Amino acid sequence: MVKFQIKKGDKVQVIAGDDKGKVAEVIKVMPKSSQVIVAGCKVAKKSVKPSEQNPKGGFVNKEMPIHISNVKKVEA
């Protein structure tokens, strides 16, 4: 497992992919898979089964992981 310079709550800029150039905050860091989840970037529509929190089910917009090499830390 590698130690990363990017932590939860850091401001990062996406440097590759559809959201290239966006600056946003890191929601979650996943060191085992070398990925991060960035707020508002790589949003996908996921289907959700009915549950107590969402009785009807349906579709939810959810941020998907981005490889850590595709983001760079930005000084706030």
Curated annotation (Swiss-Prot):
SMART domains xrefs: KOW (SM00739)
InterPro entries: KOW (IPR005824), Rib_uL2_dom2 (IPR014722), Ribosomal_uL24 (IPR003256), Ribosomal_uL24_CS (IPR005825), Ribosomal_uL24_KOW (IPR041988), Translation_prot_SH3-like_sf (IPR008991)
GO aspect biological process, one term: translation
Organism domain of life: Bacteria
This protein's record includes keyword RNA-binding: yes
GO terms under cellular component: ribonucleoprotein complex; ribosome
Keywords annotated in UniProt: Ribonucleoprotein, Ribosomal protein, RNA-binding, rRNA-binding
Similarity field: Belongs to the universal ribosomal protein uL24 family.
Protein name as it appears in the record: Large ribosomal subunit protein uL24
Gene name of this polypeptide: rplX
